[in-house]
Amino acid sequence: MTLAKIELLKQLLRDNEAKTVLKQTTVDQYNIIRKFNTSRIERNPSLRMKWAMCSNFPLALTKGDMANRIPLEYKGIQLKTNAEDIGTKGQMCSIAAVTWWNTYGPIGDTEGFEKVYESFFLRKMRLDNATWGRITFGPVERVRKRVLLNPLTKEMPPDEASNVIMEILFPKEAGIPRESTWIHRELIKEKREKLKGTMITPIVLAYMLERELVARRRFLPVAGATSAEFIEMLHCLQGENWRQIYHPGGNKLTESRSQSMIVACRKIIRRSIVASNPLELAVEIANKTVIDTEPLKSCLAAIDGGDVACDIIRAALGLKIRQRQRFGRLELKRISGRGFKNDEEILIGNGTIQKIGIWDGEEEFHVRCGECRGILKKSKMRMEKLLINSAKKEDMKDLIILCMVFSQDTRMFQGVRGEINFLNRAGQLLSPMYQLQRYFLNRSNDLFDQWGYEEPPKASELHGINELMNASDYTLKGVVVTKNVIDDFSSTETEKVSITKNLSLIKRTGEVIMGANDVSELESQAQLMITYDTPKMWEMGTTKELVQNTYQWVLKNLVTLKAQFLLGKEDMFQWDAFEAFESIIPQKMAGQYSGFARAVLKQMRDQEVMKTDQFIKLLPFCFSPPKLRRNGEPYQFLRLMLKGGGENFIEVRKGSPLFSYNPQTEVLTICGRMMSLKGKIEDEERNRSMGNAVLAGFLVSGKYDPDLGDFKTIEELEKLKPGEKANILLYQGKPVKVVKRKRYSALSNDISQGIKRQRMTVESMGWALS
């Protein structure tokens, strides 16, 4: 149907007789009937597309120069029609036209393509540099798992990503950035620079940025590696009866944020559980924790998953968590049923009576431990049935033991032979169920001997399992192994849970789904830098981490600390930050180091020779009560040793791997990390009169007054009452009269005034001398 035909039809319709004929004549073209007489949603779009693609010319060309470049035919193959299409008012073309265009079509300006389509070019780079191994044929056990479809630059929630994309592409229209957006300012700046001047439409840029920032996860059947670098090539790597060995090339994009987030959350929980109010402390530390440059809360909101520790901190911060339950390494998701808890006194196998919360009711769960998955059916104090799949022996064994303990089966209680007095990392006694869990994971034979055996089912796809985790013609009672695949259970739904003071997560039904005892005790090194901006957390770190955190804190509070020191306030040494630092000083040496460090600092103040780097270096050592020699003199040291040996020491008169200073550049290097002192070392170090450079709380009121007596020292000034006056030597020994303020003035104001006066004096002296 062309436009010319439509014009003819319009002319015909003006004639009443012709109109009647047209109305009564049937339309015999199915396509026309289909196109103009139905408005329903296609029920089977896939079939419709396949049917359409079978026709000779299924694709429409838009009008324009580009379409005109495609010839009618190429080497005897017809590429497009001459006829005009009624729907698009263009021409229709064949599938071969696409191939012709890709092969012989014009090449436009490709400048900026690599920057815009960076994720695709990185994928090509990984593919170009990949290592391909042999293909093996045979049964492939693929398990449906929730996997990330492609590697990301930085994962964030969709709403946060849309704000970041707006900030990158349309900074003027985006308005004032939210705090959650501003966290990613380095990424925003980098992307703006990269995309500057590209002629590609913003909608394409936005789509590509979304691909780099928003995670797309699907449940896919997978055998082997599940990282995004493998999943993007999954279609080439495995089928139902074949597998291809493959290792992606280039730098593997590991999710460092996720790993560092887990390390941080585990440490926060370990530190919090020893506090009088674990929840309060966990929230305080979590809100002051930064991973790289991003707050921990932002990471927890952006990154899907993590482990138990992450979910506990999420709940503490008021974020939603995935629907799942934990019991140590065992992860569970309820299929059916519900239990009710009642406290009962249970006589266990070692003759002791334990008060334990017993769950009553028939329940069914999906269970998982490592790579071993299964289905558990339990009732009150009985494990009815456990169906598991084949996996590593260690995972199978742990899953079976944990399910037996979780089911609270009477045989499990009777299997206890030794003492149950396990402690957590904080030195606290574990609750009875976690005691039993630890006991049987260490002494599995006690449990299996008590459990008993039976004949396995006769079904061909099932087999028995013995205490050595081998296939057997007898099986542990109620435990069966299936040859079929048990899919990984999905936990896509999120829910809001309440959290107790002791960091236990409770559902609305009152069911405890996980707690601090379920957090893994494995310790690993974070891939990204974690900063805990609270001294309460520092003692959990290594010696180097504690040194770095302490000196960072001193630099941050340098003005206040220096002012207190110059005013002779001895209680200034009693900061929480220094209490944490004391934990890495050998106990026998803490008092001696304190006496030495205090004596050096006092000498600096008395002799009016301020050295800021030395002040920073020695200040943390002053926390402990000072210990002196019998004659009242301090001990002398050239090197201050810290716990851990090796490079863990600080040189008093020179630099060391932990602490060094370059006076030319005014840069401190703490544990390899450079920190500038520019702007923090004022003129007091360049002038003789160090002590009088800062007069916090005093006002210079005039010239020397002989009626007020001799010049006062800093210590004597401190004893003056508000409004009292005194003589003092300022700057280069200039005699002046000062008055103590009646209200306490801001330290920073007095310090800045002191420095300003000092500069003016030095300048005037220079003018006078010239």
From Swiss-Prot:
Any GO BP: 7-methylguanosine mRNA capping
Lineage: superkingdom: Viruses
Motif (Nuclear localization signal): 740-743
GO-annotated cellular components: host cell nucleus; virion component
Transmembrane segments: none
Gene Ontology molecular-function annotations: RNA binding; RNA-directed RNA polymerase activity
Main location: virion
Compartments, record wording: Virion; Host nucleus
Keyword Endoplasmic reticulum: no
Keyword vocabulary terms for this entry: Cap snatching, Eukaryotic host gene expression shutoff by virus, Eukaryotic host transcription shutoff by virus, Host gene expression shutoff by virus, Host nucleus, Host-virus interaction, Inhibition of host RNA polymerase II by virus, mRNA capping, mRNA processing, Viral transcription, Virion
InterPro entries: Flu_PB2_2nd, Flu_PB2_6th, Flu_PB2_C, Flu_PB2_CAP-bd, Flu_PB2_middle, Flu_PB2_N, INV_PB2, PB2_helical
Function according to Swiss-Prot or TrEMBL: Plays an essential role in transcription initiation and cap-stealing mechanism, in which cellular capped pre-mRNAs are used to generate primers for viral transcription. Recognizes and binds a wide range of cap structures of target pre-RNAs which are subsequently cleaved after 10-13 nucleotides by the viral protein PA. Plays a role in the initiation of the viral genome replication and modulates the activity of the ribonucleoprotein (RNP) complex.
Protein family (similarity comment): Belongs to the influenza viruses PB2 family.
Known partners and oligomeric status: Influenza RNA polymerase is composed of three subunits: PB1, PB2 and PA. Interacts (via N-terminus) with PB1 (via C-terminus). Interacts with nucleoprotein NP (via N-terminus).
Descriptive protein name: Polymerase basic protein 2
Organism: Influenza B virus (strain B/Ann Arbor/1/1966 [cold-adapted])
